[in-house]
Amino acid sequence: MTTEKINLLDFDRKGMRQFFAEELGEKAFRADQVMKWIYHFGVDDFDNMTNINKKLREKLQHKCEIKAPTVAEAQHSSDGTIKWAMKVGDQDVETVYIPEEDRATLCVSSQVGCALECKFCSTAQQGFNRNLKVSEIIGQVWRAAREIGLQKETGRRPITNVVMMGMGEPLLNMKNLIPALEIMLDDLGFGLSKRRVTVSTSGVVSGLDQMTGKIDVALAISLHAPNDKLRSEIMPINDRWDIQDFLASVRRYIASSNANRGKVTVEYVLLDHVNDDMGHARELAELMKDTPCKINLIPFNPYPGSPYKKPSNSRIDRFQKTLMQYEHTVTVRKTRGDDIDAACGQLVGDVIDRTKRTAALKAARGAETIDVKAV
């Protein structure tokens, strides 16, 4: 019988030091050295850790491994975006690299599928299987950094920002999200600025309250409707925590945060003739008057079987200008990677659906839905 090895990617600095002390009988500085090899140099072979003595390397090889998700498939967009299908166990999640002139952002998944049922999101149509482990969250960053490193000759920009906006609702995976964020921020890990790591939530108030005062990163909220009636129709989570509960929690978080500079980013996907008329814009402006924010409008990105459409450019423009009349800061997100289905709301993986959600959707809509495995 073989003992399963411990994946060192599952440990933040505190956990790594504790493991080294209790399981290996080693001092904290040895744990720190190994973390540097893993995250600063992308090393996954203990033999290549040249400042670690042979006895410890042998111990590590016997008990431990450094195992990140592997790339099952890579797709390259004409705009430079790369979408990777990352293998996690017997399923896939998607991770997206988005290069821009002054930065390169990595969009990271937190769940296999999604436990929520937002009506406009392709990931939600796949159902839900499980939360990702720490090693599977931070491992996406590790693997992407290595993939980009291998492409240095193409002049690709190193990862400067991470957004938890991939598959899944991050705040329903708090146990594994927090250590992964700690590694992203840690100087022994990826050493990213807290303003360059963003967590997006659809309104899990219990998770946001748990984050408050515990970890400081940029916050984005998926609002997508200016009133409870409409929001509950397109985002059922609103029946659990309504808009006012959600925004009160948001205000508590940004009051405790330096990363947000006193403001939250509001994400609002524009669905043609659903939530994009001028009345909705005025309602949204009024709703957000007591919550310092910048509003990011996201024109809907279509996917197979979706009942929604992208608004016309004129409707998008009118919506933005109406909000700006109320002195809100408003941007329209530039669509990136839509030619490889890597844009916002388009991410899908290889999900063994435990919720039976996909089967129900197929029965309701007909065959034109995203094909997934069902159990």
UniProtKB/Swiss-Prot annotation:
Catalysed reaction equations from the record: adenosine(2503) in 23S rRNA + 2 reduced [2Fe-2S]-[ferredoxin] + 2 S-adenosyl-L-methionine = 2-methyladenosine(2503) in 23S rRNA + 5'-deoxyadenosine + L-methionine + 2 oxidized [2Fe-2S]-[ferredoxin] + S-adenosyl-L-homocysteine; adenosine(37) in tRNA + 2 reduced [2Fe-2S]-[ferredoxin] + 2 S-adenosyl-L-methionine = 2-methyladenosine(37) in tRNA + 5'-deoxyadenosine + L-methionine + 2 oxidized [2Fe-2S]-[ferredoxin] + S-adenosyl-L-homocysteine
Disulphide-bonded residues: 107-344
Primary localization class, coarse: cytoplasm
Cofactor requirements of the protein: [4Fe-4S] cluster
Binding site for [4Fe-4S] cluster: 114, 118, 121
Residues at the active site: 94, 344
Name the UniProt record assigns to this protein: Dual-specificity RNA methyltransferase RlmN
Organism: Vibrio parahaemolyticus serotype O3:K6 (strain RIMD 2210633)
Gene that specifies this protein: rlmN
